[in-house]
């Protein structure tokens, strides 16, 4: 009976081993601890069918089947698949007669027949249904879902090593159900904005009742001790990993969470793929920064990298330092950086904690991409700056303290009270206050004018109170230098007042000159905007003499 159901098994593939250099830098085990329990598989809900924007891309899933199935598809050309256009057949129906029916349960067959039944169920699940119409193929969809759930239990509890055929069929089934192209967005007219994201609901994957279970199967397979990495790398190869990375652009956060966990497991299990994974993530970042500024999975990719960076061996390789300089630091530039800033900040701080000499590079990078008109983004930059400074030693701080102090002074004088407050809070950090104290002769003259202007005229009372406290701290550090800075500030204020008065007198002369010329000639007079006071005086005397 079993032989009649299954028919012929696929041929054993030829071995094509791929050579790759061993990756360095392990994976932080704390990530596995927090993700050791897999996500529970929920029942199909009506919400999964609300968004059908991705359904069109899923219709092409059948084309992802390996070449071994091409002859089968060619024989069916011109014939309508079961259930009309709602079904994409990536392989032959596993049961005779072209009817999509459930195969026997694993509990109902002998142990010797379970491997064959496993292959049959995998082949059966290569049929992809269209979820854009939730009323079609309800019976077949439920049969496939129950079959997928059986495969989850089988993969999790299998008591022997997976062989070539099992790995080939499993990865083929995963590819058919998961790998797809997302609709391209109009990047020119729709740049990802955090404000827009608050108003718009993300598009959910319509086929999630099936897709979720397929992700669960892949996760159990990669994490299983019965999966031999040396054998599995022939099927979970560079192409497979790259297609997994492409799926991170999914709008469905549930899918990105599964991908994050699976890719982390792949990075930990397949050491041969580690350099390639890092390079592929780099390329995603480069394209995001330089071309699109639109990608849904940057935060998840950075979260994976945070754990990878934590496992880097010391001393850091030049490759890793270039990654920091060319990919991570420029990620502060896009307008939508607030979406992933928390994960980005964690990666940046990890690098500084690994190698304190990178602090100067990181701080100068932050100053390079410091926001000018986005106050909320500026507050986030100040928070990240504080975390970086906590890991910064005195020697590195001295290399960048002058431009850094100038930027902090600009933040202190910001009319946005949250920016000014966040800059003043830096003095509450003991380590940062010690760095300022050690270098107060350089820093105090730079920030003192900003503090004094806040004390005298900032519109926000809370900012004024915090400024007075910081002013007292500086006074306690060096009373003599404080008095010198105060005297210099007062002189500069007097000079500014005189310059302002002189400028007003200059404009008054211009107005008087224009008025007198108009009265005499009854014609408009064009006077250069920037005219020296000497020329103005000469012109006035000549006009008076005439």
Curated annotation (Swiss-Prot):
Residues 1-88 are annotated as: Disordered. One of its GO terms (cellular component) is cytosol. It comes from the Eukaryota. One of its GO terms (biological process) is negative regulation of innate immune response. Its main location: cytoplasm. GO terms for molecular function: protein phosphatase regulator activity. Residues 58-78 have a biased composition (Polar residues). Disulfide bonds: none annotated. It is found in: Cytoplasm, Cytosol; Mitochondrion. Expressed in roots, emerging lateral roots, cotyledons, leaves, floral stalks and flowers. The keyword Mitochondrion applies. Pfam families: B56. Disruption phenotype: No visible phenotype under normal growth conditions. Keywords: Brassinosteroid signaling pathway, Cytoplasm, Mitochondrion, Plant defense, Stress response. Residues 29-57 have a biased composition (Low complexity). Belongs to the phosphatase 2A regulatory subunit B56 family. PP2A consists of a common heteromeric enzyme, composed of a catalytic subunit (subunits C), a constant regulatory subunit (subunit A), and a variety of regulatory subunits such as subunits B (the R2/B/PR55/B55, R3/B''/PR72/PR130/PR59 and R5/B'/B56 families). The B regulatory subunit may modulate substrate selectivity and catalytic activity, and may also direct the localization of the catalytic enzyme to a particular subcellular compartment. The holoenzyme composed of PP2AA1, PP2A4 and B'ZETA acts as negative regulator of plant innate immunity by controlling BAK1 phosphorylation state and activation in surface-localized immune receptor complexes. Required for the formation of the PP2A holoenzyme that negatively regulates brassinosteroid signaling by dephosphorylating and inactivating BRI1 in the cytoplasm. This is Serine/threonine protein phosphatase 2A 59 kDa regulatory subunit B' zeta isoform.
